[in-house]
């Protein structure tokens, strides 16, 4: 069993305080604050942003595994996770995560791609950990074969 470690350090009260988030690998060492949770344009991160990054990364790796297992090698996968953070009553909640992925995958058809993307969403370990949260998926196939053909046609017209 693998165990991954992350640490949060905080100084001060909730509103004026601030802290640092680090991970065991050393790859992340960033400031965070209450203000960075509620206001755009802050130079610090927040737990929701990091959760979105973790979910986007996990889902994308799961989709790559699904595609590879079905005999397709993706040229590129690009996923954005939008995490909705809302005040409900006296508390804040993560109410929804929207995954939006686009992919260049030679030779895969739309039906197969959509089925594999749905399976990746369902079985990604982070999706499973967030089962109490509504998770939606919009998957767009930018077929690499078609893109190449369109580029060749456009170049031929000049």
What are the roles of these predicted feature ranges?
Residues 1-53, 60-158:
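Extended beta-strand/beta-hairpin segments
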């Amino acid at each position: 069993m693998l165990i991954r470690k992350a640490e949060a350090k905080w100084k001060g009260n909730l509103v004026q305080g601030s802290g640092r988030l680090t991970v065991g690998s050393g790859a992340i060492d960033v400031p965070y604050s209450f203000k960075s949770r509620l206001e755009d344009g802050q130079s610090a991160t927040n737990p929701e942003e990091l959760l979105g990054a973790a979910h986007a990364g996990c889902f994308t790796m799961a989709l790559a595994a699904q595609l590879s297992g079905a005999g397709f090698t993706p040229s590129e996968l690009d996923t954005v996770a939008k995490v909705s953070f809302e005040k409900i009553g006296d508390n804040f909640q993560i109410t929804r995560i929207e995954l939006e992925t686009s992919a260049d995958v030679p030779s895969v058809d739309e039906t197969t791609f959509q089925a594999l993307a749905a399976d990746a969403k369902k079985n990604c370990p982070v999706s499973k950990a967030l089962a109490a949260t509504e998770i939606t998926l919009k998957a767009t196939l930018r077929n690499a074969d078609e893109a190449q053909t369109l580029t060749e046609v456009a170049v031929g017209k000049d």
